[in-house]
Amino acid sequence: MSMPLLKLAVVGCNSAAGLLETLSELKLPLAAFYPLDRDDEGELVSFGGDDWPVLELADFDWKTADVAIFLAHTDAIADALAAGCKVVDASGGEPQRGAVPVPPVTDVLLARLLGAFKAAGDVQFAVGTGLLAVSQEGQAGIDKLSEQTRAIFAQQAVEVGTTYAKRIAFNVVPVAQEKAAASATKLAKKLGVPLSLQLAHVPVFYGHSLSITARFGAPVTADALTTAFTDTGGIYLLPSGTASSQDAIGGDQVWVSNLAVSDDGLSASAWAVVDNSKLTALLTLAALQAALEAR
């Protein structure tokens, strides 16, 4: 679909600066661009090869924009919808009626992997552990890892702050189990596969990783599993070696390696990595297209 020229507002342009940069690379057709944030009015952000001053969110007239992308959750979503804006919600907050949501990268990652396992055999249940890069939390996560790392090397006191429950530099911080369980329950219902999920924040700037194991109702072969993963859209099965989160940076596919089947053929496991920022940008673009097509 070719897009019309957009009068585009982006909310949370400072809190999600990394994602904004990736969105800029998609070269959206713009008639006007309005970078908005609750703070930092007057600061400059780069988008589409130009520098733009950040506008105060509270003072913005939503009738001047025809589409809005929310990278940060705010009650202004309701104001944008009321003014007739097409709204794409990439904030990860509670779904808003009338807004087109952007699915979380972890959900898309798990859906692709479970889809491949289901193509190989009758999946009874699956168990996964996801390792989340700090860019999951936007610029706040990137800044916190940078600050804490510098403080440790300088032998200074490390400020934990509010972004993570514990120090993130040189550490692994589990996500609250209630949040992980809620995500697993929602996905299990959607995909028809019981799922147990653990999530943790790791001191990596970009690139999510996931280890997943599936249990089958009948034995599967290594060949069948390889074929299923090779044929599943959005997955790149590494022919040999191991994929690291750095390998996936800049791409939109889920890289899979370490694909293994148990001796009895009743369980199989895989290691997967994905560029969370790039994939989120592409999912946001797809949501934007859906919003423009909606009446």
Regions found by a protein language model. Give the residues of each.
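N-terminal Rossmann-like NAD(P) cofactor-binding subdomain of oxidoreductases
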Residues: 2-166, 192-194, 218, 222, ...
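Contiguous C-terminal substrate-recognition/catalytic subdomains in enzyme active sites
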Residues: 61, 159-249
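A structural motif
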Residues: 128, 212-213, 284
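Hydrophobic side chains in beta-strands
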Residues: 130, 174, 214, 258-259, ...
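Glycine-rich phosphate/pyrophosphate-binding beta-alpha loops
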Residues: 201-203, 274-278
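A generic structural signal for beta-strand entry/edge sites
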Residues: 209, 265-267
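Short, well-ordered beta-strand elements
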Residues: 268-274
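Flexible, small-/acidic-enriched active-site or ligand-binding loops
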Residues: 276-282, 286-292
